[in-house]
Curated annotation (Swiss-Prot):
One GO cellular component, as annotated: mitochondrial matrix
Keywords on record: Electron transport, FAD, Flavoprotein, Mitochondrion, Respiratory chain, Transport
Name under which the protein is recorded: NADH dehydrogenase [ubiquinone] 1 alpha subcomplex subunit 10
The protein's assembly and partners: Complex I is composed of 45 different subunits. This a component of the hydrophobic protein fraction.
Main localisation: mitochondrion
Length: 12
């Protein structure tokens, strides 16, 4: 993942 609020969570 490179965008969205989960980006920081997933580290992608």
């Amino acid at each position: 993942l490179q965008y969205g609020p989960l980006a920081x969570i997933l580290g992608e």
